[in-house]
């Protein structure tokens, strides 16, 4: 019997944007390669609700491969403005509430996978009462907003992020009885269990674009930080590196990623040794990783290595993250610093230290234990269909 699944993503899946959009792209690719029909429901700003299929209208912002492999793609507008304000739902979730999406999902009997907290409030709709729904959380939203609250200086922003943290926790608790969860690690599972005092929670490791090491030996040319710069937390991490690490460390530092804010662009070009490369193509981004001497990927929210750090391990030379990344099998592949000054000390030690063949061999042995996307797809299918 032909298997089909509805996947809901708050953003258009993209292989060139580390984070949720990238993970959604790879899980769709794995499912389609396994012969499973994927019906993708996604959001974009200032868009009318349109459907894109092999025979239908092609959304120019959608990756051509998605149009080729998905059974259907339907996009909806992201809600903006004060009308999204609610005393019970965080703004981050209210902007994805859409009655037409609920009606479209009610038309079939396929299981539903919601990617991230954003669109998850639709699980409360009475029209979807009889649906089997899973929510895959790659980031624990209350912790995410708590980090933004801590890093924000403006009182109103602090209050806003505090409110988002409280409401997102309430929302996750509210839908816990309605959905099943998928998280990337045992530590993430423990976090949810402590919040929900139970719940149906499965673990599924992060998908990846390759299981090979292409790192080059010798010396690179600069330090690099990369990520989804449109994301508030990634933006603040980039600002932290500029203002706390490279403000008085005159080592070449490059930031790259999609849609950086004008303020970040201005800050990155204030010093002669720092710069930003906005919206690189996939080949350009890979080239920057391969030519870097040090990959910097602090992780202030997630417990384990994120997608950008894993890319650095597989394609780059020396990698540095912070001390919150603990208990990881990838630990031999990176250095850890607990503070800005610790980052500076490690950078000074490594910047003129050639990357060796021995270090590459260590990474190859560790990466060899990774599960392939094919194996992860099989695990996912077992979670959904048993």
Protein language model regions, located:
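Conserved catalytic-core segment of nucleotide-activated headgroup transferases in glycan assembly
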Residues: 203-270, 276-283, 290
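Membrane-proximal helix-turn-helix segments that form the acceptor-binding/catalytic region
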Residues: 26, 100-106, 141, 152-181
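A charged, aromatic-enriched C-terminal amphipathic alpha-helix characteristic of glycosyltransferases
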Residues: 96, 354-385
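Short N-terminal targeting/anchoring amphipathic segment
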Residues: 103-121, 132-134
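N-terminal subdomain of nucleotide-sugar transferases
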Residues: 1-70, 247
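Acidic donor-binding loop of glycosyltransferase active sites
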Residues: 290-304, 317
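Helix-loop-beta element that forms the nucleotide-linked donor phosphate-binding surface
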Residues: 125-131, 173-208
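Acceptor-binding helix/loop patch of EC 2.4 sugar-transfer enzymes
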Residues: 78-91, 131-167
């Amino acid at each position: 019997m032909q298997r089909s699944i509805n996947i809901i993503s708050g953003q258009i899946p993209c292989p060139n944007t580390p984070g949720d959009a990238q993970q959604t792209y790879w899980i769709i690719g794995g499912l389609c390669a396994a012969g499973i029909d994927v019906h993708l429901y996604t959001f974009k700003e200032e868009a009318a609700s349109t459907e894109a299929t092999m025979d239908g209208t092609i959304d120019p912002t959608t990756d051509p491969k998605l149009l080729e492999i998905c059974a259907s793609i339907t996009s909806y507008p992201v809600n903006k403005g004060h009308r999204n304000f609610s005393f019970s739902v965080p703004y981050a979730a209210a902007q994805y509430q859409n009655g037409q999406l609920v009606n479209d999902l009610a038309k079939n009997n396929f299981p539903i996978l919601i990617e991230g907290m954003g669109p998850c409030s639709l699980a409360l709709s009475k029209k979807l009462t009889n649906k089997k729904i899973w929510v895959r959380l790659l980031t624990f939203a209350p912790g995410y907003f708590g980090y933004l609250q801590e890093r924000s200086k403006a009182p109103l922003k602090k209050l806003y992020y505090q409110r988002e943290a409280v409401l997102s926790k309430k929302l996750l608790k509210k839908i816990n009885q309605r959905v099943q969860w998928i998280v990337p690690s045992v530590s993430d599972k423990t976090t949810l269990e402590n919040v929900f005092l139970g719940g149906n929670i499965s673990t599924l490791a992060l998908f990846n674009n390759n299981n090979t090491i292409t790192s080059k030996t010798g010396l690179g040319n600069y330090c690099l930080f990369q990520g989804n710069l449109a994301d508030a937390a990634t933006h603040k991490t980039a600002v932290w590196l500029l203002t706390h690490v490279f403000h008085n460390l005159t080592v070449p530092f490059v930031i790259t990623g999609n849609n950086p804010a004008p303020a970040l662009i201005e800050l990155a070009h204030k010093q002669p040794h720092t710069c930003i490369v906005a919206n690189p193509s996939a080949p350009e981004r890979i080239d920057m990783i391969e030519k870097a001497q040090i990959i910097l990927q602090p992780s202030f929210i997630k417990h384990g290595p994120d997608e950008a750090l894993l890319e650095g391990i597989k394609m780059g030379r020396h990698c540095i993250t912070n001390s919150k990344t603990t208990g990881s099998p990838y630990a031999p592949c990176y250095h850890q610093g607990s503070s800005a000054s610790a980052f500076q000390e490690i950078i000074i030690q490594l910047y003129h230290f050639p990357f060796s063949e021995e270090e590459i061999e260590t990474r190859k042995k560790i990466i060899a234990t990774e599960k392939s996307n094919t194996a992860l797809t099989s695990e996912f299918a077992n979670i959904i269909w048993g």
